[in-house]
Amino acid sequence: AIDAIAQSDPDFNQPVELSGDFLNLNLNTGSGVYKGNFIAKQGSMKFEGNEIKVKQKANKELDNIIALGNPVKFKKKNYSSGEIVSGSAKKITYDANKLLVILEGEAEITTDLGKSFRSQIITYGLTSGEIEAKGNSQRRVQIIIPPNSARKSTPIVE
C-alpha cells in the first residue's frame, strides 16, 4: 500500500527538511522543537510558521509534526487532481502515519482552482483529497465553490 501511495504521490519518497532560527533536539528520542521563522518541507509539501515540534518513531521515521503560528501556512500539490492546496490555521498537525493534515483555529483551505473551506477544525487527507470540516458556536463551516467557467442553458424542448 505504501508503494502505491509513493507512486501516486512522490512527495512521500522525499526526506523531510527542517529549518528555523533555533533548535532544541534530543538525539536519543529524535524529538525536537524549532522556533523562529521555521520551514518544514517534504517534496511539494511545505509548512511555515513560528514554532514546530517534530516527533520521530523508534526507527527514526517521522511520526508527526505540530506547527504553531499566527497563522501557520501549509501548501501541497494534490497529484491526483493537479490542484495546489494551501491552508492556514493557528495550529497544524501533520500525521505522517495516516497522511493527514489537521488545521485548528481559524482554519482555512483553498485551492488554486478557487475552492475554499473555512472552519474551526479542518482535516485534509493528503492522498485521498478528502476534507472534513467541523464548526462551533462561533464559526460555522463555510464552503465556496467557484462557478462553472462555460455555462450554457440546455434547451428545455428539443
Locate predicted features.
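Mature-chain termini and adjacent capping regions
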Residues: 1-158
